[in-house]
Regions:
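Extracellular glycan-interacting surfaces
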Residues: 2-328
Length: 328
């Protein structure tokens, strides 16, 4: 009897020990999985915020310590200064061969085929400027000057008879360069600086002065983000150009020399805008309700106009905030 009791005590002790070890291991596993998940989430958050922190660091290095802003036109002023510095001309008899880099276009955001020549292509990149090909894309050369704005986000050719050598490209990539979503951090947006025009079929580009001059420190000006450009295909008496910009649809009657607000709320700017025009000159515009201001934009929605001045709101009841326009 004593022997049986002794064996039962031992068996019970072993069972209790096994239960203790099982629950201890389970608890440790739970704590380990929670800790691993927390570390993974922390690492993920760090990766997502790294480029934003890097952009902020770059801004701190470039800003004027007195104003806290990056001076307007600083890139062109920098190039003008360096062009006057003394250069060392002696090459010590060495011979150099160009080895690169050659692929400096970056992400391409827009491309158009010349209406007169299907071999002639123009393409714009996020940070590498405008590029031109005359052999259906087999070879490319850069057509923007080093001191020009290198962010080419939209492109259009004037399709009126006798005007085909005129092109326009807009600057400013408004979606975040880190995750391709909407961002309120100006330093993770490819802020642009206006519209450029070519009158020699895309060989060279000139900035439209009325759209220039914004500081790259923040998103404040209309022409810092140009979503789309269209030209009036009907009017021959005036060079009418429309630009869907940050906050407004802009209109020019003289090929971009001067601009007026055609549609938009300048005080409470729509973050995203878009524009389309039919073959007979009817305009359709979309302005988002999403904005960076406290008050909502007063002109958010979808609009239609036959003259670029008078607009009729045609927004459906279930329209979303961000709007894209397209005409087949």
């Amino acid at each position: 009897m004593k022997k049986l009791t002794f064996l039962l005590v031992i068996a019970g002790s072993i069972a209790l020990a096994m239960c203790f070890l099982f629950f201890h291991a389970s608890s440790s596993s739970i704590r380990l999985s929670k800790g691993t998940a927390a570390r993974t989430e922390k690492k993920k958050m760090s990766e997502n915020s790294f480029l934003t922190m890097q952009a902020d660091c770059q801004f701190m290095k470039l800003k004027d310590p007195k104003t806290g802003l990056i001076p307007p036109g600083i890139r062109s002023r920098e190039l003008a200064f360096t062009s006057k510095l003394p250069r060392y001309a002696e090459d010590a008899g060495q011979s150099w061969t160009w080895r690169g880099p050659t692929n400096i276009g970056g992400r391409m955001l827009c491309i158009t085929v010349d209406i007169d020549d299907q071999n002639h292509l123009l393409a714009g990149s996020a940070s590498g400027g405008m590029w031109e090909s005359t052999d259906q894309g087999l070879n490319w050369h850069k057509s923007t000057a080093p001191d020009a704005e290198q962010s080419a986000t939209c492109l259009v050719q004037d399709k009126r008879p006798g005007k085909h050598r005129t092109w326009y490209y807009g600057t400013g990539e408004m979606l975040s360069t880190t995750d391709r979503n909407i961002s309120t951090n100006a330093r993770t947006i490819g802020i642009g600086n206006g519209i450029y025009k070519s009158t020699d079929n895309g060989a060279t580009w000139q900035p439209l002065a009325a759209t220039q001059g914004a500081s790259p420190s923040g998103l404040n000006e209309i022409f810092q983000g140009v979503w789309r450009i269209v030209t009036d295909p009907v009017r021959m008496d005036k060079d009418i150009v429309y630009a869907a910009c940050y906050g407004a649809i802009m209109r020019s009657e003289n090929g971009g020399i001067s601009w007026q607000v055609a549609l938009g709320d300048i005080e409470n700017k729509s973050f995203a805008t878009d524009l389309a025009i039919t073959s007979d000159g009817v305009l359709y515009a979309g302005l988002s309700s999403f904005c960076l201001s406290v008050e909502p934009p007063g002109k958010a929605g979808i609009w239609r106009s036959t003259d670029g001045f008078n607009w009729t709101k045609i927004t459906p009841a279930d329209a979303r905030s961000l709007i894209t326009c397209s005409i087949p």
